Amino acid sequence: MQILRKKMPWRPYLIRLTVLALIMAVVGTYAMMRYRIGIDTQQERCLPDTTVYLIDLWNKEPVKEGLYAFHSKGLAPLYNDGTRMLKRLTGMPGDEVKVTPEHVLVNGAEVSTGMALAQRLGVAETEFSRSLTLQENEYWFSGEAATSFDSRYWNAVKREQIVGRAWPLW
């Protein structure tokens, strides 16, 4: 015995499919304009608990202790200018920074310890020692690992280098 099926018109399905495709295209375009995925492939990560980050290109407003992606500048030969880096913002304009071989203090609070990379860089630990006040549009970035290549080695990052706020995914 044959079951009779009523033939359904294809036009309503085509309209729904077109609307769905347009919505997906708009949402996809918005996401591609606003967000990037950052993946830390280093063996020794400066932020040890996370490998993948969502970077919000439209959120560049600096907030202390936030994670930010920024473009490197003047770090050759280790990194080409424009290399995207990701660190924790630990110093804002007006903050007092003191760097010694033992630790880095921002307004008297320790944000990093030691100079684990000084020997690899071929520079004496004491060469990085300094005290400074962060100027307008200058930000201090730190990694959480002792081996993080961060502001203690290369100084402050300018506001225009900041790419966007980063959120850890996994």
Where are these regions (language model features)?
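Extracellular/periplasmic metallocenter environments
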Residues: 128-129, 134-156
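Short, exposed beta-strand/loop patches in secreted or surface proteins that constitute
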Residues: 44-45, 89, 96-97, 131-132
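Protein maturation boundaries and topogenic segments
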Residues: 1-84, 133, 152-170
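PP2C/PPM family metal-dependent serine/threonine protein phosphatase catalytic domain
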Residues: 107-126
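Mid-length scaffold segments of soluble, non-membrane domains
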Residues: 80-111
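Solvent-exposed loop/turn segments at secondary-structure junctions
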Residues: 60, 97, 104, 147-148
